[in-house]
Amino acid sequence: MVDVMDTDEEATGDAENRDEEVTAEEPIHDEVVDAVEIHEEEVKEDDDDCEGLVSDIVSIVEFLDQINGYRRTQQKECFNLVRRLKILIPFLDEIRGFESPSCKHFLNRLRKVFLAAKKLLETCSNGSKIYMALDGETMMTRFHSIYEKLNRVLVKAPFDELMISGDAKDEIDSLCKQLKKAKRRTDTQDIELAVDMMVVFSKTDPRNADSAIIERLAKKLELQTIDDLKTETIAIQSLIQDKGGLNIETKQHIIELLNKFKKLQGLEATDILYQPVINKAITKSTSLILPHEFLCPITLEIMLDPVIIATGQTYEKESIQKWFDAGHKTCPKTRQELDHLSLAPNFALKNLIMQWCEKNNFKIPEKEVSPDSQNEQKDEVSLLVEALSSSQLEEQRRSVKQMRLLARENPENRVLIANAGAIPLLVQLLSYPDSGIQENAVTTLLNLSIDEVNKKLISNEGAIPNIIEILENGNREARENSAAALFSLSMLDENKVTIGLSNGIPPLVDLLQHGTLRGKKDALTALFNLSLNSANKGRAIDAGIVQPLLNLLKDKNLGMIDEALSILLLLASHPEGRQAIGQLSFIETLVEFIRQGTPKNKECATSVLLELGSNNSSFILAALQFGVYEYLVEITTSGTNRAQRKANALIQLISKSEQI
């Protein structure tokens, strides 16, 4: 059985984080908005390199994506802020390996903005609901301060030096326009809320004690249960303690309304100004401590549906699925690469959690959803799908590009877009005589294809021949994204056959030979997956794949040695493949990688030599001439687990060959 390479983050998962890429409390301040100000002249440079800074920023976004329970008064703005921050993920992935002083300075400043956004969003998740409703204007000022600072940092980014793709630059320009246009919004619900609060605090309005208004406010602010009111009391105490500048009138209004809500629940009104302030985290844990093993390592929340991944670690199913959907193929806790992305229910742990909760009378928290946000997204998608059939060229261009961005954003959008009937229309646009529409259509399909159901829908619509046509004749970025789309679709075995029969392999080999670095990587991953099909191995060999692969082995700077060796391993299982690669110079190259390559290089090269030698002992004899034996002995004790297995098998094969 031929071992194949572990496809990494440059594969299908990357479609979410790339358009054309291969490839987680602060006190609330009313007067002092400077808590989120980023003073450019005072930005301290961090010692991290650019790679580390990018990882930090991406980690912040991943953390923010897990935050639940935004206060209703700021919920929509919170979702908007997170969405805008996530737009930068593909750009960050694109510059991840770039190192320069100007890039480091830019990323340091960008991280400062993301940290400020994190503080604000945590406040909107944990802060006093009454205060945020009472002083919504100040909260909006803080959001707009973030927008202004983010725009300022992006405008001064060293784009020319970073050499990012034109499409990534267009997305950043579009984001900057959004940030500039962001207006302070007052929803109808907010107006009603403001009027109710004005009535409640009025000294002259006879309705100020009207229980119906109080009940309505309690419902809007979600302060209707005893637990809600206890949590709000702690939040207000912390606010008053931390915020020394909170004026007396504001304090009185907050406490007055809190006491009105308490009376509705039959609780005694108290003056919390004179009660000791208890830290919220301590309050939650003094009476009951959650067992560490019950908490998801990603969210640090109790697990409702624990599942086991390939490394044996357990996570909340929803959280780890989001991690995978974002294109990651590593364990979040151990950072190990995963052999597979299968999830196995941890029934034993789930039963333990349920028993513990029942025994301790622990109420499992419900996660909040945003139905308003979901409905808005559905409406937006419906309008975009309708616009795909417009007779106006510019409207078609705008809609397909916007859909492309939505499809990349999250798994939910991919399902929404497919359910709205977009896939047949997008497939039709692949043949549209406009290079921009073609490029955006094929990239949208690439992003949609991350979803397994969508893979089938796309191929059932007959998209593959049209994608191959763009691969042959489209512009540079369209060709690269077509290759990535073919890789994604080829995850289904029937599509491997269809792509091979549709003559999709020769243009992939051409892109591997003549494409840009990203184009080569897209082609390489697609060809690897297609070569898992026996008939496609022969097609790839006939298309001349061997020489481009050998060329990749000569240039370490391209960073594709392991991938090239992995495809050569597949080809070595084919008679024509062995004939094409079995040159003396290639055997010498393999031995050189076994001698002084990276651990993964050694693993892959040893695997290729074992496959060749298992079919023809002359390859073993040739390798011995280049001194391979002592290098294999070293690998048996110091190599990766797989490399050790392969080296031991190869040593046994050498012993048999010598006996013969």
Swiss-Prot record:
Q: Which GO terms describe its biological process?
A: cell surface receptor signaling pathway; protein ubiquitination
Q: Which GO terms describe its molecular function?
A: ubiquitin-protein transferase activity
Question: Where are the compositionally biased (Acidic residues) regions?
Answer: 1-24
Q: Which SUPFAM superfamilies match?
A: ARM repeat (SSF48371), RING/U-box (SSF57850)
Q: EC annotation?
A: 2.3.2.27
Highest taxon of source = Eukaryota
Q: Which UniProt keywords apply?
A: Repeat, Transferase, Ubl conjugation pathway
Domain U-box spans what residues? Answer: 289-363
ARM repeat residues = 411-450, 452-491, 493-532, 534-573, 575-614
Q: Where is this region: Disordered?
A: 1-29
Pathway note: Protein modification; protein ubiquitination
Name the reaction it catalyses.
S-ubiquitinyl-[E2 ubiquitin-conjugating enzyme]-L-cysteine + [acceptor protein]-L-lysine = [E2 ubiquitin-conjugating enzyme]-L-cysteine + N(6)-ubiquitinyl-[acceptor protein]-L-lysine
Top EC group: transferase
What does the protein in this record do? Functions as an E3 ubiquitin ligase.
Q: What is this protein called?
A: U-box domain-containing protein 15
Q: Which gene encodes it?
A: PUB15
